[in-house]
C-alpha cells in the first residue's frame, strides 16, 4: 500500500505545471524514503529529476517499493480539479492498475482515479559532478529573463564567469543582452573556475522556469563538458533538478 498526503495542493499543481508540456509520461518511484522521478523528454535533450522526501508529506506510507507510471497529460487534468488550499492524498494498492487522488477542502471531499500505464522504464543514473560555475539567483527573475530573451530568438546564449551571468539573444528584430552582476542582492556567484558559454533552446529554459513558484531562488550550474543544470530546493518538501544539453555550434548552424 502506498499513501502520500500533501499539506496543500499547491506543490503538486506547480510541479505538474512545470513539466506537463515537456514530458509525455513519468514514473514515480515510491519507497520508504519518499517519491522520486527521473524522466527525459522525447528528444533526449532535457532531463527532469524530482525527489520528494517522505518527511515532507503530512502523511506518508509505503509498504514496498512501488513504481507508478502515469500520463502527464492525464495527470494534469486531474490536478486542475484541486484547490491549492486543499490537502491532497495520493494512494495506490500493491499491484494495482490505478492511482487515486483524494482532495479534501473543508466540507468537500473529491476522489479521482488515474489509470496507470504499462511502459518500459529506463532508470537513469545522475552522477555527482563538479561544475565549473555555480550561481544563485531569484527564480522569478530567471523566469522573466528567459521570457524576455525568447521575444528575440528561439536560442539563448548564456555565459557565466566571476563577474556574473549574461544572457543574450540575436534575432531578426534585433538583439537582447541581460547581465547579472555579483553586486546584485538577488544574485551571487558561488563558484567560477573559468568562463563558460553555451547556447540553449529557449523553449526548454522557459519550461524549466515555470518552477519559479516552487522556490524563491534557483541555483544554476554550468560546465564546458556537462549539461546545464537548474536546481530548485522546495522548502520542507524536496528538490527539483532540470538538466539541458547545450546546442552544438558549428559555424552558422546549430544542432542538438
Swiss-Prot record:
The keyword DNA-binding applies. One of its GO terms (biological process) is regulation of DNA replication. It holds the Pfam family PCNA_C. The keyword Transcription regulation does not apply. InterPro entries: DNA_clamp_sf (IPR046938), Pr_cel_nuc_antig (IPR000730), Pr_cel_nuc_antig_C (IPR022649), Pr_cel_nuc_antig_CS (IPR022659), Pr_cel_nuc_antig_N (IPR022648). One of its GO terms (molecular function) is DNA polymerase processivity factor activity. Keywords: DNA replication, DNA-binding, Early protein. It comes from the Viruses. Disulfide bonds: none annotated. Residues 61-80 bind DNA. Stimulates the viral DNA replication. The virus utilizes both cellular and viral PCNAs during viral DNA replication in order to produce budded virus (BV). In addition, stimulates the expression of late genes 38K and VP39 by promoting the transcription of IE2. Belongs to the PCNA family. This is Probable DNA polymerase sliding clamp.
Amino acid at each position: 500500500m502506498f499513501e502520500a498526503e500533501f499539506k496543500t495542493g499547491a506543490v503538486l499543481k506547480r510541479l505538474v505545471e512545470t513539466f506537463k508540456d515537456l514530458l509525455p509520461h513519468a514514473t514515480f518511484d515510491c519507497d520508504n524514503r519518499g517519491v522520486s522521478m527521473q524522466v527525459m523528454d522525447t528528444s533526449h535533450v532535457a532531463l527532469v529529476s524530482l525527489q520528494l522526501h517522505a518527511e515532507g508529506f503530512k502523511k506518508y506510507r509505503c509498504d514496498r517499493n512501488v513504481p507508478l507510471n502515469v500520463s502527464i497529460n492525464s495527470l494534469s487534468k486531474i490536478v486542475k480539479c484541486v484547490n491549492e488550499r486543499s490537502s491532497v492524498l495520493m494512494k495506490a494498492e500493491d499491484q494495482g492498475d490505478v492511482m487515486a487522488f483524494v482532495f479534501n477542502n473543508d466540507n468537500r471531499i473529491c476522489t479521482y482515479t488515474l489509470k496507470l500505464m504499462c511502459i518500459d522504464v529506463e532508470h537513469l543514473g545522475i552522477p555527482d559532478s563538479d561544475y565549473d560555475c555555480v550561481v544563485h539567483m531569484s527564480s522569478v527573475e530567471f523566469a522573466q529573463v528567459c521570457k524576455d530573451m525568447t521575444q528575440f530568438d528561439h536560442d539563448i546564449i548564456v555565459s557565466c564567469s566571476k563577474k556574473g551571468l549574461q544572457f543574450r539573444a540575436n534575432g531578426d528584430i534585433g538583439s537582447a543582452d541581460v547581465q547579472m552582476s555579483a553586486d546584485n542582492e538577488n544574485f551571487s556567484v558561488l563558484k567560477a573556475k573559468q568562463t563558460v558559454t553555451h547556447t540553449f533552446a529557449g523553449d526548454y529554459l522557459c519550461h524549466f522556469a515555470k518552477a519559479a513558484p516552487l522556490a524563491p531562488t534557483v541555483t544554476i550550474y554550468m560546465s564546458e563538458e556537462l549539461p546545464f543544470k537548474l536546481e530548485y530546493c522546495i522548502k520542507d518538501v524536496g528538490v527539483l533538478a532540470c538538466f539541458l544539453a547545450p546546442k552544438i555550434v558549428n559555424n552558422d548552424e546549430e544542432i542538438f
